[in-house]
């Protein structure tokens, strides 16, 4: 294992003029490093992302099915309300002959309340679908970000030597000192 690590370290010390090799300096990225990181992210993240999306899809489909069942119940209630409306209309015609207008108001109230109930159920269904979609998108984003961060940390930890670590700290301290002098 040490020989493999030494061979990668020695690749980083080759002259860059006219040569081709891995750049082990994490601060000087190149297309090879970027393609390796992207390849690793795609390779390892594809399965997890696919499973996550499938689970989300099933939850959304279940929510849609539940909403459709609620819609079916609302339609059934609407049919009952229509039957009741027909009955009320017949009674209204009988009472209208006698001069009663109270039945007409009850009919309108019944229609309005039924339509309001249907609108509320439709709005609830749409809000539920939208909420589940947003939640799925946010979870996928969070999962992808976590995987990218873990991959980047893994790459950093595997490429970071003590010497490089000390040089990075020294450079950051120097930049901090320069910033402090500028602000004073």
UniProtKB/Swiss-Prot annotation:
Keywords of this entry: ATP synthesis, CF(0), Chloroplast, Hydrogen ion transport, Ion transport, Membrane, Plastid, Thylakoid, Transmembrane, Transmembrane helix, Transport
Stored Pfam families: ATP-synt_B
InterPro entries (alphabetical): ATP_synth_b/b'su_bac/chlpt
CC terms in the record's Gene Ontology section: chloroplast thylakoid membrane; proton-transporting ATP synthase complex
Transmembrane residue ranges: 27-49
Top-level division of the source organism's lineage: Eukaryota
Membrane-related topology note: Single-pass membrane protein
Endpoints of the signal sequence: none
Main location: plastid
Annotated GO MF terms: proton-transporting ATP synthase activity, rotational mechanism
Paired cysteines (S-S): none
Localization per record: Plastid, Chloroplast thylakoid membrane
Family: Belongs to the ATPase B chain family.
HAMAP family xrefs: ATP_synth_b_bprime
Subunit structure: F-type ATPases have 2 components, F(1) - the catalytic core - and F(0) - the membrane proton channel. F(1) has five subunits: alpha(3), beta(3), gamma(1), delta(1), epsilon(1). F(0) has four main subunits: a(1), b(1), b'(1) and c(10-14). The alpha and beta chains form an alternating ring which encloses part of the gamma chain. F(1) is attached to F(0) by a central stalk formed by the gamma and epsilon chains, while a peripheral stalk is formed by the delta, b and b' chains.
Role this protein plays: F(1)F(0) ATP synthase produces ATP from ADP in the presence of a proton or sodium gradient. F-type ATPases consist of two structural domains, F(1) containing the extramembraneous catalytic core and F(0) containing the membrane proton channel, linked together by a central stalk and a peripheral stalk. During catalysis, ATP synthesis in the catalytic domain of F(1) is coupled via a rotary mechanism of the central stalk subunits to proton translocation.
Remarks, miscellaneous: In plastids the F-type ATPase is also known as CF(1)CF(0).
Name of the featured protein: ATP synthase subunit b, chloroplastic
Native organism: Populus trichocarpa
Lineage: Eukaryota, Viridiplantae, Streptophyta, Embryophyta, Tracheophyta
């Amino acid at each position: 294992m040490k020989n493999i690590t030494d061979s990668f370290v020695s690749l980083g010390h080759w002259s860059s003029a006219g040569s081709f090799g891995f750049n082990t300096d994490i601060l000087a990225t190149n297309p090879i490093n970027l393609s390796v990181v992207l390849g690793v992210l795609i390779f390892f993240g594809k399965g997890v992302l696919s499973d996550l999306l499938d689970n989300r899809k099933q939850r959304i489909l279940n929510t849609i099915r539940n909403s459709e069942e609620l819609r079916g119940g609302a339609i059934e209630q609407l049919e009952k309300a229509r039957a009741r409306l027909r009955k009320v209309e017949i009674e209204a015609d009988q009472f209208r002959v006698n001069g009663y207008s109270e039945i007409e108001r009850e009919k309108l109230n019944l229609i309005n309340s039924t339509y309001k109930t249907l609108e509320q159920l439709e709005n609830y269904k749409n809000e539920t679908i939208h909420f589940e979609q947003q939640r799925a998108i946010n979870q996928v984003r969070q999962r992808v970000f976590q995987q990218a961060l873990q991959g980047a940390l893994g790459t950093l930890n595997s490429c970071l030597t003590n010497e490089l670590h000390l040089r990075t700290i020294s450079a950051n301290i120097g930049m901090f000192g320069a910033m402090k002098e500028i602000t004073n």
